[in-house]
Amino acid sequence: MKRPVLIGITGGTGSGKSTVAKEIYNKFDEACIAMIEQDSYYKDQSSIPFEERCKKNYDHPDAFDNELLIDHLKNLVDLNVIEKPIYDFEAHNRKEETIKVEPRDIIIVEGILVLQDPRVRELLDIKIYVDTDADVRIIRRLLRDINERGRTVDSVINQYLTVVRPMHMQFIEPSKRYADIIIPEGGHNRVAVDMMVANIKHLLQK
């Protein structure tokens, strides 16, 4: 097995980056592709009371255990199996169990700050930024956090105004300059997704 092709997909919250990642993932046989979600690598917070966990800024680079993420990506590049963490968004903490991820021809790394850390960037063969209007992103975030993460409307809006938007402007938006490809309109841009799939297939044939 050759060195895997690592693809980084980033963008603001609700930009459609997960949709783009899934669209690309679904174009390949499951035996040759794996998904690494940056959200799985939030730091372990077992020693912090739940009330304090609720107040933390989860859109700041310090919220992520990039040391573990980088170690896992390097292991996959070296064709080693990893144990990917599972994060519980309602408990704001990692679960005890993990998911075994085996090396594959293609590794997708998806998350809001994938391009922010230069150590992660240098491991990536293709860097994608999904660019979507802010009003679309906040509506998607609102629906997701209420329906999937047990949040209230007020808490989501307050978090967006005080944390999510400032962090987007400070860390996520500036990382766009590191992207090889910028995809507008998120996962609905079928032409861009098809072009990416063709590019990945070309890299695999080298």
From Swiss-Prot:
Main localization, broad class: cytoplasm
Listed Gene3D superfamilies: P-loop containing nucleotide triphosphate hydrolases
EC code: 2.7.1.48
Entry's localization field: Cytoplasm
Record's catalysed reaction(s): uridine + ATP = UMP + ADP + H(+); cytidine + ATP = CMP + ADP + H(+)
GO MF assignments: ATP binding; cytidine kinase activity; uridine kinase activity
Cystine crosslinks: none
Pathway: Pyrimidine metabolism; CTP biosynthesis via salvage pathway; CTP from cytidine: step 1/3; Pyrimidine metabolism; UMP biosynthesis via salvage pathway; UMP from uridine: step 1/1
A GO CC term assigned to this protein in UniProt: cytoplasm
Ligase in keyword set: no
Pfam families, per database record: PRK
Entry protein name: Uridine kinase
Lineage: Bacteria, Bacillati, Bacillota, Clostridia, Eubacteriales
Record gene name: udk
